[in-house]
A protein has these predicted regions:
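HIT superfamily nucleotide-processing domains
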Residues: 8-150
Length: 150
């Protein structure tokens, strides 16, 4: 596990990033962001896009983080389309339990999808994601999920 405050590519790894399983869940590392597999899969391919550093409000991020975010989102949507062909992609920024700036990315599906050795159903479709239906990934499934997006 990373040490809190560990320096990575120009930014700091914070407690929220660690809570979502970093470094085991790391898919991509950017200057201002990390893309992680969400250890509790609400829908197949659920991800976390977390800002590096200690910002706890979206407006506290440096201007460069917003610029980079456009590139990151384009890459996220591409890897999800290639790997899982979602019908929609939802982005939720809650930050009520985990305080640092981060987004939950939920690919949405009309039907079930196979992912990381599991068959997952989007229980909230066509409404909001059903966060209570999340399936915890074990370490083997996390490795498979990360590999699916590399």
């Amino acid at each position: 596990m990373a040490r809190h405050g560990e320096e990575r590519r120009g930014g700091m790894i914070n407690a929220t990033i660690e809570k979502f399983g970093y470094p085991a869940t790391l898919v991509r590392d950017y200057r201002h962001w990390v893309l992680l597999v969400r250890p509790a899969q609400v829908t197949a391919g659920s991800l976390i896009l977390a800002a590096k550093g200690e910002a706890t409000a979206y407006g506290e991020l440096p201007a460069d983080a917003f610029t980079e975010q456009g590139t990151v989102i384009a890459e996220v949507e591409h890897i999800l389309r290639v790997a899982l062909s979602p019908d929609k992609i939802n982005y939720l920024m809650l930050m009520m339990v985990d305080p640092h700036v981060h987004f939950h990315i939920f690919p949405r599906y009309r039907g079930a999808r196979s992912f990381a050795g599991l068959v997952l159903t989007d229980h909230g479709w066509p409404g909001p994601p059903d966060l209570k239906s999340a399936v915890e990934l074990n370490s083997t499934a996390i490795v498979q999920a990360v590999a699916a997006f590399r």
